[in-house]
């Protein structure tokens, strides 16, 4: 493995004026009403400050977030090889800085070729030891902004991971019926007889208000089942979880006999080990310790919706096994097998061939603003009537911006509406600022949205990814608008170190020095010409550079109107009017 100590890099943040003056932003800024724009506005951050006041009193002490994810560096060569970087991010910086590449510090690089799984803790031992040292003793650091030495300390606030990595770091198994780390043993998930898969169908009525009509419905959910009086058990504290792990006898992955002991205990419990993060003395007091990765959940939800609506063979959740047991679970005779033909009828949420072609041809023609999204037309397969090769950001854009428009004329209103509500939910949840009022509303609305979807889609549609959104508002409420995890894909130790050295050295240049790095916009170059004509509107001063060969054509009337509108909306000179 490769380990890059975090302490010297945290000290370097105070060695340059470009960063040192921003390191107390979290303590100096004032929250705008009940709107959270940074993790420091969150209840989890404030609770940590209350419990550890000595640490919080020094605003220069650093609070960190950790993320880890695997990647395949040799996918183009067909070789199975998985590497796992572990990245730390300081949250002291303002929102516009803390998620930039130069402030995402690669600390551990676990080599392949295999996924380390629950043995990940073995590779995290030096990091946890260093974090304990930074918490208990700290390190003397020179603050170039205040021109004084101080004892720098650091604390890990939480981790942010996709679902498989969540299990590796937290010790809670994210596979099987107890996969949800919030419901835990109190889950209502069940195993489908035909496919053997776990289903979270009809697991969301307990989150509804006590008098909601869905709770008494015995036809649209599981047959004859009411959810009267049942409620979500609530989120357990770190002290409660640690006490349970110790009572059951789980061991850390690197302790003697851990493999056999943990394997036996995990057969009857949701835990698979005692996480190494419990070695941090403050970890049990953290309000939230492991965050779900919203982008990962959103992508999986989108894939399930889109593949089911397009009825993609092998990927749709509405397959023969699902239909065979559908009416054993819920009352939907209209989707039962036709005894005369032996076939299952088309569901109202599935598109016919003509509608699929209309949808995919529309996607091929979509044009986005430069840098907004990738070219989705490359993902369209008109021959197979499906989409392929969509990345997480492609799914993110499609789910939040295109899905309601794309399906509005193609699906019945009772199907389109809850899908649109789910799209709006993800759009609001991933906004850069969140108000308490909006989060309370989202926490109330998401169970209703999921229940509406349960009245439409089959039980096989609802895997753990369709269930997890019900817990996302709570995480956002506790931790604030935590930006999506960073990923240093394809980085190797030598190349990463060279890049980090170059970035850090650049911060030693004086302010105003032309060699200080400036992030240019897309399609900009250092030698871009600027027209200094005072009478010319600001939007026309930069001289454009063509991206490809030139041509000539006349604009249509609607194109002229669109161009004029864009200019009027983006000229600072006319804002007063």
Name what the model sees in each region.
Residues 1-49, 59, 114, 135-389, ...:
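Domain-level detector for long, ordered catalytic/regulatory cores in large eukaryotic signaling
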């Amino acid at each position: 493995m490769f380990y890059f100590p975090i302490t010297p890099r945290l000290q370097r943040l105070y060695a340059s004026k470009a960063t040192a003056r921003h390191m107390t932003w979290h303590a100096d800024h004032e929250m705008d009403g009940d709107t959270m724009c940074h993790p420091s506005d969150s209840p989890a951050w404030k609770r940590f400050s209350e419990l550890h006041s000595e640490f919080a009193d020094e605003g220069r002490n650093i609070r960190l977030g950790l993320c880890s994810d695997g990647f395949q560096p040799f996918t183009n060569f067909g070789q199975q090889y998985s590497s796992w970087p572990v990245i730390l991010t300081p949250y002291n910086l303002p929102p516009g800085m803390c998620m930039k590449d130069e402030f995402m510090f690669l600390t551990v690089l676990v080599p392949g070729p295999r996924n380390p799984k629950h043995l990940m803790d073995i590779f995290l031992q030096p990091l946890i030891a260093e974090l304990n040292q930074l918490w208990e003793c700290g390190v003397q650091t020179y603050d170039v902004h205040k021109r004084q030495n101080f004892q720098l300390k650091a604390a890990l606030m939480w981790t942010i991971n996709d679902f498989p990595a969540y299990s590796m770091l937290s010790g809670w198994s994210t596979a099987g019926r107890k996969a949800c780390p919030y419901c835990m043993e109190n889950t209502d998930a069940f195993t489908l007889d035909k496919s053997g898969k776990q289903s979270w169908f009809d697991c969301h009525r307990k989150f509804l208000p006590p008098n909601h009509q869905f709770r008494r419905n015995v036809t649209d959910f599981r047959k004859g089942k009411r959810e009267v009086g049942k409620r979500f058990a609530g989120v357990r504290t770190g002290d409660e979880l640690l006490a349970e792990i110790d009572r059951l006898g789980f061991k850390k992955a690197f302790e003697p006999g851990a493999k056999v002991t943990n394997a036996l205990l995990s057969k009857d419990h949701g835990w698979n080990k005692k996480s190494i993060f419990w070695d941090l003395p403050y970890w049990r007091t953290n309000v939230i310790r492991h965050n779900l990765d919203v982008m990962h959940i959103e992508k999986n939800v989108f894939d399930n919706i889109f593949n089911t609506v397009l009825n993609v063979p092998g990927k749709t959740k509405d397959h023969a096994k699902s239909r065979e047991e559908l009416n054993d679970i819920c009352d939907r005779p209209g989707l039962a097998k036709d005894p005369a033909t032996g076939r299952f009828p088309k569901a109202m949420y599935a598109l016919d061939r003509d509608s699929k072609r209309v949808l995919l041809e529309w996607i091929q023609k979509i044009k986005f603003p430069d840098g907004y999204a990738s070219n989705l037309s490359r993902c369209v397969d008109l021959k197979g009537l499906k989409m392929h090769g969509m990345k997480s950001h492609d799914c993110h854009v499609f789910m939040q911006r295109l899905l309601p428009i794309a399906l509005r004329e193609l699906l019945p209103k009772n199907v389109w509406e809850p899908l649109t509500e789910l799209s709006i939910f993800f759009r609001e949840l991933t906004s850069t600022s969140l108000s308490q009022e909006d989060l309370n509303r989202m926490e109330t609305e998401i169970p209703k949205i999921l229940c509406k979807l349960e009245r439409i889609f089959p039980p096989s549609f609802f895997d753990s990814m369709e269930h997890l959104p019900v817990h996302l508002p709570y995480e956002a409420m506790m931790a604030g608008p935590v930006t999506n995890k960073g990923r240093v894909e394809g980085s190797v130790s030598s190349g990463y170190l060279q890049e980090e050295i170059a970035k850090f050295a650049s911060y030693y240049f004086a302010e105003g020095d032309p060699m200080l790095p400036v992030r240019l916009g897309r399609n900009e170059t250092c030698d871009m010409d600027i027209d200094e004509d005072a009478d010319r509107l600001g939007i026309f001063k930069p001289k454009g550079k063509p991206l490809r060969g030139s041509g000539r054509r006349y604009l249509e009337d609607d194109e002229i109107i669109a161009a004029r509108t864009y200019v009027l909306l983006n000229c600072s000179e006319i804002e007063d009017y």
